[in-house]
Amino acid sequence: MFFWYQNHVIAKLLVWLLFPFSLVFWFISVIRRRLFRLNWLKSYRSPVPVLIVGNLSVGGNGKTPVTIWLVKQFQSRGIKVGVISRGYGSRAEYYPYLVKIDDNPTISGDEPLLIAQRTGVPVCISPNRQQAIELLLAQFNCDLIISDDGLQHYKLQRDFEIVVIDGERVFGNGFVMPAGPLRELPNRLAEVDLIINNGKLTGYSNTLMLLLPKFAVNLVSGEKKLLRDFQRIPLNAIAGIGYPQRFFNMLRDFALTLEKTQSFQDHQDFDAVHFSYFSSNQPLFMTEKDAVKCRPFAQANWWYVPVEADIQGEEVERFMQVVSQQIKEKK
């Protein structure tokens, strides 16, 4: 919500109006987690290690690029990975559902489809994470399960936890939902194995992730062009991600001229009507996550910008070694 990251009078008023509800949310969350830790509520232990990639706050913090980066890193170490996701926005006829790389994103969800296309590993979506893991292990020889999101899904026991923090917005006003963006308070960070800062260091760790664009890809032809090839052309841009401004800022950092921009809600289900606002004579840029949903009605001058995560820091290398060693020992 807009007021989570603002400091004007109306934002403060909304915070205090919603604060009693935040107290209730926080209390229920604390009690619920305590019941899981005491085994009063049942949880599932996977026969292979589980790594959770999550966050403390609502909205796009960069979990999916981290998941893709992790999969590729473990693949380079000879570790077979399976990915599970709740599949937010998916409308599969049944669950658990194994994502196919040519799926319609309305069936699989945009992020699971993107992970499957970028990595080639098996991806299974289901609100029931246990069923997703069991299906993956029944059909694939996985050494490691990575859960894209699910830090607060305590029905699933985990061996490792990664939290991704938005380096620009961090934790907003610092309140838990609905007065603020937090699902859990920052003291939860003391319990996780690795903290990754997206874009800027925050003081919570020295591990930094940069999302590096290399080129633009045409949605119709597949042609690739360097971003600098568009520097003298007025462009339009859309983004249906958790923090659209990050995408627009990235394009401007490459000296691209954005004439019109349009932000959509995260996981927006696009159709051609959403783009009637833009001139068909100008290039339209979008994220790769948005592109998987726009291909059926894409025009000849629509482009998406894939990014590669570059994660730096001694902590991440130590983390990778610890996880790899545990997997080898379990084998």
Curated annotation (Swiss-Prot):
InterPro entries: LpxK (IPR003758), P-loop_NTPase (IPR027417). Its EC number is 2.7.1.130. ATP binds at S57, V58, G59, G60, N61, G62, K63, T64. One of its GO terms (molecular function) is tetraacyldisaccharide 4'-kinase activity. Pathway: Glycolipid biosynthesis; lipid IV(A) biosynthesis; lipid IV(A) from (3R)-3-hydroxytetradecanoyl-[acyl-carrier-protein] and UDP-N-acetyl-alpha-D-glucosamine: step 6/6. GO terms for biological process: lipid A biosynthetic process; lipopolysaccharide core region biosynthetic process. SUPFAM superfamilies: P-loop containing nucleoside triphosphate hydrolases. It is an enzyme of class 2 (transferase). Keywords: ATP-binding, Kinase, Lipid A biosynthesis, Lipid biosynthesis, Lipid metabolism, Nucleotide-binding, Transferase. Pfam families: LpxK (PF02606). GO terms for cellular component: plasma membrane. It catalyses: a lipid A disaccharide + ATP = a lipid IVA + ADP + H(+). PANTHER family: TETRAACYLDISACCHARIDE 4'-KINASE, TETRAACYLDISACCHARIDE 4'-KINASE, MITOCHONDRIAL-RELATED. Belongs to the LpxK family. Transfers the gamma-phosphate of ATP to the 4'-position of a tetraacyldisaccharide 1-phosphate intermediate (termed DS-1-P) to form tetraacyldisaccharide 1,4'-bis-phosphate (lipid IVA). NCBIfam families: lpxK. This is Tetraacyldisaccharide 4'-kinase.
